[in-house]
Design a protein with these regions (language model features):
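Acceptor/aglycone-binding surface of glycosyltransferases and processive sugar-polymer synthases
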Residues: 79-97, 102-105, 114-194, 221-231, ...
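Short beta-strand/loop segment that forms part of the nucleotide-sugar
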Residues: 48-58, 79-81
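Acidic helix N-cap motif at the loop->helix transition within catalytic regions
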Residues: 32-36, 60-68
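A conserved acidic beta->alpha catalytic loop
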Residues: 55-64, 110
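Short, acidic, metal-binding catalytic loop of nucleotide-sugar glycosyltransferases
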Residues: 39-48
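Residue-level signature of catalytic and energy-coupling elements of molecular machines
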Residues: 94, 109, 179, 204, ...
Length: 316
């Protein structure tokens, strides 16, 4: 497959030319490292792009550091997340603000290789719903990091590829590119940790959308404490690991399954990449509930139509 790195420019809302790539970076207490991460990204990405850094609070020193950068870099935005604290909510909010058709999620701690942002985006532009930077494919590797976490991640990734044909050997790595239209279609359910990567990989697998990968070399952070919490976030990872196995689902069936698990009263936020503007808290609760209700209703109608057609064929 030939990858084009210079596709025609997209036109966004209001007639403005949209960037080719939206880079989303969740950041918390990364003031000492975010500057180097931004330097590497802007030096590596030659295509039109926007970089969206999402923090939990303006009190985080990361906010001041990125704001100073943004004063001289028009492609950079620093936003305070409105969906709650934590990396999952920061990623969801950042993707909702993305103007490009491809969103690439990367970390602020310099563990990811920004030279791979454009190749990942090219895979999405060529039809993949999810493109993963894989530590466990040929040519990839992981340098440093907790041994237990690495073993679990490697086991999960390789078993999903072998048994579920997930499309990548590294479903758990957060360094991925996504089609924003695909995310609008399936939504994001994760609300804590970094489970979004495996969630969207599993959803793509179940609705039979393409998942692609390229090898990557992942470097453990040189300083500071990682925000990754293996035991606390394990249930979320296990949920999406198991979800990857199963029959093909339509987008409506997928939405109906998510609706059965939804708790809008506790999580009043619309799905990631909802194309409607951000609304007050109460309005967002209604939109979230309505989205799931409509999807579930559509699925019930389709099921009834299928049963009716089957009964008609039997009678004939």
């Amino acid at each position: 497959m030939t990858l084009s790195l210079t596709p025609p420019a997209a036109v966004g809302a209001g007639g403005l030319t949209a960037p080719r790539i939206s880079v989303v970076i969740p950041a918390r207490n990364e003031a000492a490292r975010i500057g180097r991460a931004l330097s590497r990204i802007f030096a590596s990405v030659r295509s039109s792009c926007e970089v969206i850094v999402v923090v939990d609070s303006e009190e985080d020193p990361t906010w001041q550091e990125v704001q100073a950068w943004a004063a001289a870099e028009p492609r950079l935005r620093c936003l305070v997340g409105e969906y709650g604290p934590g990396p999952a909510n920061a990623i969801r909010f950042g993707i909702d603000q993305a103007r490009a058709g491809v969103a690439v999620v990367t970390m602020a701690d310099n563990s990811d290789d920004p030279r791979q942002i454009e190749p990942l985006a090219a895979l999405v532009e060529n039809g993949a719903a999810v493109a993963a930077a894989s530590r466990y494919s040929k040519g990839g590797s992981q340098i440093g990091g907790p041994i237990g976490k690495s073993l679990l991640s490697r086991l999960a990734g390789r078993s999903l590829q072998l048994l579920a044909r997930a499309g990548t050997r590294d479903a758990t790595n957060s360094f991925k590119a996504y089609s924003t239209s695909f995310i609008r279609e399936v939504g994001i359910d994760s609300r804590q940790g970094f489970a979004i990567g495996i969630e969207l990989t599993a959803k793509a697998r179940r609705v039979r959308r393409d998942v692609a990968e390229i090898p990557t070399i992942w470097l453990d952070r040189e300083e500071g404490e990682s925000g990754f919490r293996v035991l606390a976030w394990m249930p979320a990872y296990l949920r999406w690991y198991l979800f990857c196995f199963g029959r093909r689902l339509t987008a409506g069936e997928l939405a109906a399954r998510c609706a059965r698990r939804a708790r809008p009263e506790a999580d009043p936020v619309p799905p990631a990449c909802d194309p409607t503007p951000l609304a007050p808290r109460q309005a967002r609760t209604s939109e979230w509930a309505a989205w799931h209700v409509v999807a579930a209703k559509d699925e019930l109608v389709r099921a009834a139509q299928s049963r009716g057609a089957a009964e008609s064929r039997g009678a004939a």
